[in-house]
């Protein structure tokens, strides 16, 4: 999907809207004087409700605020909410009404003023609204930056609250000071002793895999302008980029990827004696990125190449042997890089399916998967299964982030299966490049999970199983019911629709049915959790297999046979 196509579509709809609004204004002005012809309105002019729906859909451009190519497969932008002065005044009035007079007197006695600052130092890159780069940075960093700026620049606060807020801001500043390209570095992967492959790291010539080059995003005449970036574990390996702030093919921008790669190396791989120099480079790199200064950015990358060549390898190995904390954002960066190389050039093939069928393609976002996998207690002793694994995103994330003993996926579509193979190959190469141990991953591709011998073999051992049944029809849901019958007690099922049908009642002729032993919990689906919309599309469900029958299926409200009794209120 090209950027030009998106912008041209937006301009067409905006022109249609302007013409339609002009017509509506003319009609409103002449409504009292001019009679309306019966055949003039129907079929020739869009109604206001139709136009509102089209305008609403055009708010959600798919790539404009993200540095990596964001097609229908990845996050979508929330519409910007502009707060007017009247809304701010109204909010101030409401907040004043809530405070009692006694509290106001106490606050005035112990109050102090805090000077407003232009831009807090702890605001991440990308928080400036006027910067050209803003559209290419993550919306999350913008929101978090605004919240921190507001907390520091408030007017009068009590002396106790002021000291607390200052301490909190200092804490945030210290924790975020070293995080510019990566986000939320405080959240770490579950510790496991075998995350880094020290045997591979000890040998500088052990990397022999081939990486997918970023040349695919560059025009032929620009290939000669590519510059190499070295990797800290294998300085002899260079990945070539076109260091340019303009968006390339498929909406790709290499600068944030380079920044994340360098910051990850400084954060995890640099020995303590070299960290200060590395952090200075990252800050300079971020400044050049915000200014869209390509020449300065290129010079800093070359300085980084020279710096990592001077670091003794034994210090790097010693640092990684101490099992440093690995941020989740580093894992997501690695997954995103593999996704970009393997999926984006072929993404259009995933659109070839029958609408509203069992073969409709959709993805679950990495942030959402991190949350739900933690809720299920996924760990290095778990076996994970994904029935309908698509391009393999959930399978490889469960393996890399949580270190599952085995991660298994089953996919029937040919195009998605091809891309799953490409993505797994790229992931293995990049894990070796970063010296990471990748636990076992297995796929059953171009096959259905129905009557699948490998699925039948793994089901009794499975600890967590993911079934994206958002649009499954009744016959396929019946097949899912048959597949999960062999799950052991304690295993968990993640789904977007409840595996057990609403209003399910126990069948005394089929007491062994696993639906009788499912404890189903529903959770609110966060925004930006699925690929087809940024909005929350309802709930997701985690069903736990119990040893005994779930007592909730005996509850009349669950059976749906007794309506909720509401008290009758009499009014005059």
From Swiss-Prot:
Function statement: Histone methyltransferase that specifically trimethylates histone H3 to form H3K79me3. This methylation is required for telomere silencing and for the pachytene checkpoint during the meiotic cell cycle by allowing the recruitment of RAD9 to double strand breaks. Nucleosomes are preferred as substrate compared to free histone.
Further comment: In contrast to other lysine histone methyltransferases, it does not contain a SET domain, suggesting the existence of another mechanism for methylation of lysine residues of histones.
Region ranges (Disordered): 1-48, 75-173
Location of the DOT1 domain: 245-558
GO molecular function, one term: histone H3K79 trimethyltransferase activity
Gene behind this protein: DOT1
Biased composition (Polar residues): 1-19
EC number: 2.1.1.360
A Gene Ontology biological process term: methylation
Recorded family membership: Belongs to the class I-like SAM-binding methyltransferase superfamily. DOT1 family.
Keywords: Chromatin regulator, Methyltransferase, Nucleus, Repeat, S-adenosyl-L-methionine, Transcription, Transcription regulation, Transferase
Gene Ontology CC terms, in alphabetical order: chromosome, telomeric region; nucleosome; nucleus
InterPro entries according to UniProt: Dot1, DOT1_dom, H3-K79_meTrfase, SAM-dependent_MTases_sf
The protein, known as: Histone-lysine N-methyltransferase, H3 lysine-79 specific
Highest taxon of source: Eukaryota
Enzymatic reactions: L-lysyl(79)-[histone H3] + 3 S-adenosyl-L-methionine = N(6),N(6),N(6)-trimethyl-L-lysyl(79)-[histone H3] + 3 S-adenosyl-L-homocysteine + 3 H(+)
Enzyme class: transferase
Pfam families: DOT1
